[in-house]
Amino acid sequence: MARKKQVGRRLEGWKAKKWYRVYVPDAFGKAEIGDAISADPENMVGRIMTATLGEVVQDYSKSHIKMRFKINNVAGDAAYTEFVGHEVTRDYLRSMVKRRASRIDTIHPVVSKDKKLLRVTVVCLTLSRADQSQVHAVRQAISQALSARAAESDFETLVKDIVSGDMARDIFKAVKTIYPIRRVEITKSKLEQVAAV
């Protein structure tokens, strides 16, 4: 004979849980990006939420950028987040790469004015194939441009510049004098830690 399922305790646990609205930081207009459920508000802190930039700023031409936010504060039924990284989708990146051209990837750690360490990945696409010395020179120029921009910006401004494409435009200007460049894209960023002073 089949046993009866015990659903009472499971149902009680579910009823004890509460829904929280999740908001992005002020830098992105404190938009609501979704809901999360938890029995204890303290369990919410540290959770990672993802959303596309298109959803955050209501501009769906930017849906290829995936944003990551970490919940750092819960007040009432609202959960507030901080930016911890972004990534460009692989499909978008693949569509940019052309034949008979070089793709130059640079991963560089930068420290903002308020001492936050961010690891940034930049992809630089050339018009024609570059040799090894040109690739090295381009990577150096990218690293210098990133470090200089980060040193004069606080974390919030730095993140805005990265996600909006302003920093990529500055890097493009710095690099195009070295070798003919078709495009520069900051494809990934990740908040590592608060940098040591």
Swiss-Prot record:
One of its GO terms (molecular function) is structural constituent of ribosome. Transmembrane segments: none annotated. Keywords: Ribonucleoprotein, Ribosomal protein. One of its GO terms (cellular component) is ribonucleoprotein complex. Pfam families: Ribosomal_S3Ae. It comes from the Archaea. Disulfide bonds: none annotated. GO terms for biological process: translation. Belongs to the eukaryotic ribosomal protein eS1 family. NCBIfam families: PRK04057.1. This is Small ribosomal subunit protein eS1.
